[in-house]
A protein has these predicted regions:
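Active-site-flanking structural segment that lines cofactor/substrate pockets
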Residues: 40-58
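Pocket-flanking alpha-helical
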Residues: 54-59, 64-80
Length: 285
C-alpha cells in the first residue's frame, strides 16, 4: 500500500488561499477543495485536511496529520510539540500591544492595566518575562473595540498594516511576536513519511527561492563584460553568448529581488543595454 502524507491546512481565513496556492505552485493537483473537510492529490501522495487553525497544532502533535501549515502565533499560543521545519513567507503579521493613541506610553505603563487579547498564553509569557502584573481579559474576536467599550485599557492583537488600530483610535507600542505561516511536522514520523516530507520540502524551497530571484538578460559591449560580471554573480557565473553584431554579447544571469533595482542601475551605468527581466517559476539548486 502506498503511504500518503497527511497535511492539515486552514479551512478558511487568511492562510487558506496562500496554502492552496503554494501546493499548486509545487505541482500538486488537488481534487475539488470547495466546501470539503478532506481531499487528495492525483499526482503526489498527499491527503489534505481542512481544519480550524487553532486545531492544526494538536492534530499534528497527535499524529492525526503528519504535517501542517499554521501561523507561528497559533502554534506558540497552543504550546504544542510540533516541529517547525520551514518558514513559508506568507501570512506575515505581528502580535502587538496597542493603547489609546492619545496616551503617552512610558515605563511600567502596563503595570496594573486591563489587557484584552485572544492570545492569553503568549501575553502572560511576555508579562512574566518583563515582571509585569496585569489583568488579562480573554476575548475571541474584535479585540480592537475593547478600549472603546471600557473593557480594557490595552489590547494585545495581531497587526498587519496597522489600519485597524488607526480606525479604532489606537497606536502600537510593543511587539510580542513576529509571525508568519510555517510548515510543522509531527516529531515521530517514520522513515517513509520523512522521505515524503523531504520531497515536498524540496519543492517548497524551490518555489520560494524562485520568488526571491529574477532571471535577467542583457546586451553589453565585450570590453565592458568584466565590469558586468562583477555585478552579476548568478548561481555560479553568468551565461555569455556572442551576438551577431561583432563586439557585443548577450549575458544571462539571476538577480536577487532584494538588490534588484540597485543592480539594474549599476548595470546600465556599466554599459548594459536591452535589459529584459523574467520571473522564475521554479529554481532548483
Amino acid at each position: 500500500m502506498i503511504q500518503k502524507l497527511r497535511i492539515a491546512i486552514q479551512k478558511s481565513g487568511r492562510l487558506y488561499d496562500d496554502s492552496i496556492s503554494l501546493l499548486k505552485e509545487c505541482g500538486i493537483d488537488l481534487r475539488n477543495v470547495k466546501d470539503r473537510l478532506k481531499t487528495e492529490s492525483d499526482n503526489f501522495p498527499l491527503e489534505v485536511f481542512f481544519l480550524r487553525d487553532d486545531d492544526i497544532p494538536q492534530y499534528v502533535e497527535d499524529g492525526v496529520a503528519d504535517i501542517g501549515i499554521v501561523g507561528k502565533n497559533v502554534l506558540y499560543e497552543k504550546c504544542k510539540e510540533a516541529e517547525i521545519i520551514e518558514e513559508l513567507g506568507f501570512g506575515k503579521c505581528r502580535l502587538a500591544l496597542a493603547i489609546n493613541k492619545n496616551e503617552e506610553y512610558v515605563a511600567n505603563y502596563l503595570q496594573g492595566k486591563r489587557i484584552a487579547t485572544s492570545y492569553p498564553a503568549l501575553l502572560q509569557k511576555y508579562l512574566d518575562e518583563n515582571k509585569i502584573t496585569a489583568e488579562i481579559h480573554e476575548i475571541s474576536g474584535s479585540v480592537e473595540i475593547a478600549p472603546g467599550i471600557g473593557l480594557a485599557e490595552v489590547i494585545c492583537d495581531l497587526v498587519s498594516s496597522g489600519s485597524t488600530l488607526f480606525m479604532n483610535g489606537l497606536k502600537e507600542v510593543e511587539t510580542i511576536l513576529e509571525s508568519q505561516a510555517v510548515l510543522v511536522r509531527n516529531k515521530s514520523l517514520d522513515k517513509e513519511h520523512l522521505e515524503l516530507v523531504n520531497k515536498l520540502l524540496f519543492r517548497i524551497r524551490s518555489v520560494k527561492k524562485a520568488k526571491r530571484n529574477k532571471y535577467i538578460l542583457l546586451n553589453a559591449p565585450n570590453d565592458q563584460l568584466s565590469k558586468i560580471f562583477e555585478l552579476l554573480p548568478g548561481m555560479k557565473s553568468p551565461t555569455v553568448l556572442p551576438l551577431a553584431e561583432e563586439g557585443w554579447s548577450s549575458v544571462h544571469s539571476v538577480l536577487s529581488e532584494d538588490e534588484f533595482w540597485e543592480k539594474i542601475e549599476q548595470l546600465k551605468a556599466a554599459g548594459a543595454q536591452g535589459i529584459l527581466v523574467v520571473p522564475i517559476e521554479k529554481m532548483i539548486v
